[in-house]
């Protein structure tokens, strides 16, 4: 008895590149991207553009080599921030890893005053969404719409990564169970070897409903308020302004960059800032666009001459690819079913920590500069990611033009503790890569002296960037910088909620796709209850 209009800026999700798992790398790095916003950050004060001389490093000799700073030293490198621009949003272009975060994260949200958002409160919504092919127990459900599956590619290098890692840390077969800590293989949001985005899981089954209207290729300019109540959205369809009225409420689901900037264009935010952009302030809410948090990540790549590894400029992979394509078409298994980052770990850089503070991703290809740097040959890479950064940034509109990219400033590494933890995390990662059987692969593209903290810091400043998990810019809470309450309604306004990763008050310890889906499931129940549906 309720009609719903879904408005998406991007096109339909009907590309084979979306649904074939391993092809997401081509979507992210397309020179003329159709399915992502190719955002960049503003220049980051703690980033540099230092490059190192590529060479062979012997892992047995502390990663070998010395980090060399060239004479042409450029500071303030920009980061890359691609976001999904199609039905399903970033769940249609991500690496599909199913990670919820740590129990501590949600209990921390509740401790900040967000009643109803503790781990025990949100676990039922993780389970409600989940259709897990491997597990059904206190932590998992096997009948939800979001299919969760094992990776359908048995890569020997991932097995070697786990063998090396478990000589130092415990093994786990479930990062989302009783204890997150350990090393193992990721699960993915796939079904029968195909990407299982939120569009596949939720939207496609609902398309036949007569009360659902889906608009694609439609840009939302702003929300229209009457007496501080959301009454309509102003859209641009093929450049022509249209106004879509709503009888009940507007739900903003634009993510950590889309939702706060839409609020700002609508006149909701810091008054002085809005007036500087010639926007009338409808409602002053200083937290809009503040509290940006993101996982910073460092990657090391190793060239290995192997048929089992991927490479964009690799003769072996070029020769193998046609057979892998046929294998995927016939069986939905093999390299093209892979999320590329197949193995991983959640580890502590200090034994006294309550929860892991770093995450590793072991990838079956050399993923340099988000895959934008084409590296000849085959190889593997390993990421180390800082799970709970102390650095906090902002996102703001550049102008009131909805087609202008936002000004994204994560302020990566601005808090000294983040660099300290990243250095420790780098050493943890290299300890694993320096252990049999991985230590036989010693051709490191950018060798760093593992015993020189300053060299490691320089490498991190030169090569680290996001791993695509921005959150917090419309944070939930009851303090003066909170944007939404625990029902996800915008403070001081009526008829408008935010339902996406931007409402997270703090960053969770893991990938953010599954937590965002949990938020949406919980929001659906809140909306049903408050509207007596």
Give a label for each model feature.
Residues 1-533:
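N-terminal redox-cofactor-binding region of secreted/periplasmic oxidoreductases
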């Amino acid at each position: 008895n309720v009609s719903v209009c879904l408005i998406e800026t991007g096109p339909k999700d009907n590309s084979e590149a979306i649904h074939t798992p391993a092809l997401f790398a081509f979507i992210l790095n397309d020179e003329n991207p159709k399915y992502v916003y190719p955002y960049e950050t503003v220049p980051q004060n703690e980033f540099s553009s230092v490059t190192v001389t590529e060479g062979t490093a012997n892992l047995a000799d502390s990663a070998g080599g010395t980090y060399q700073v060239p004479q042409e030293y450029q500071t303030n490198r920009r980061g890359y921030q691609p976001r999904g621009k199609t039905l399903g949003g970033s769940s249609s272009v991500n690496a599909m890893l199913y990670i919820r975060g740590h129990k501590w994260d949600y209990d921390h949200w509740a401790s900040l005053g967000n009643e109803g958002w503790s781990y025990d409160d949100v676990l039922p919504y993780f389970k409600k969404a989940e259709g897990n092919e491997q597990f059904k127990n206190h932590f998992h459900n096997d009948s939800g719409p979001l299919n969760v599956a094992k990776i359908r590619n048995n890569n020997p290098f991932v097995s070697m990564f786990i063998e090396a890692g478990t000589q130092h840390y415990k093994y786990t077969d479930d990062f989302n169970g009783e204890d997150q800590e350990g090393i193992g293989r990721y699960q993915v949001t796939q079904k029968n070897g195909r990407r299982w985005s939120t569009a596949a899981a939720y939207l496609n089954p609902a398309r036949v409903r007569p009360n659902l209207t889906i608009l694609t290729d439609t840009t939302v300019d702003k929300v229209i308020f009457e007496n501080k109540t959301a009454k309509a959205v102003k859209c641009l369809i093929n450049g022509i302004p249209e106004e879509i009225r709503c009888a009940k409420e507007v739900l903003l689901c634009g993510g950590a960059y889309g939702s706060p900037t839409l609020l700002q264009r609508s006149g909701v935010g810091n008054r002085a800032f809005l007036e500087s952009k010639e926007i009338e302030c409808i409602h002053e809410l200083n937290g809009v666009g503040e509290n940006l948090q993101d996982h910073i990540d460092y990657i090391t790549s190793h060239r290995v001459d192997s048929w089992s590894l991927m490479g964009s400029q690799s003769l072996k992979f070029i020769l193998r690819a046609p057979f892998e394509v046929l294998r995927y078409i016939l069986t939905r298994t093999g390299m093209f079913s892979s999320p590329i980052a197949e193995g991983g770990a959640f580890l502590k850089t200090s034994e006294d920590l309550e929860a892991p503070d770093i995450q590793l991703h072991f990838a079956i290809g050399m993923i340099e500069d988000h895959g934008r740097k084409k590296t000849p040959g085959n190889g593997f890479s390993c990421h180390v990611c800082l799970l709970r950064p102390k650095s906090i940034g902002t996102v703001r509109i550049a102008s009131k033009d909805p087609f202008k990219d936002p000004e994204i400033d994560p302020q990566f590494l601005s808090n000294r503790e983040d660099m300290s933890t990243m250095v420790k995390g780098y050493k943890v990662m290299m300890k694993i890569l320096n252990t049999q059987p991985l230590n036989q692969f010693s051709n490191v593209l950018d060798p760093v002296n593992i015993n020189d903290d300053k060299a490691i810091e320089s490498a991190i400043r030169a090569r680290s960037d996001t791993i695509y998990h921005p959150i917090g810019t419309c944070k939930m809470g009851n303090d003066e910088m909170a944007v939404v309450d625990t029902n996800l309604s915008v403070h001081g306004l009526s008829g408008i909620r935010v339902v996406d990763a931007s409402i997270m008050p703090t960053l969770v310890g893991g990938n953010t796709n599954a937590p965002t889906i949990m938020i949406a499931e919980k929001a659906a129940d809140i909306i049903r209850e408050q509207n007596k549906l």
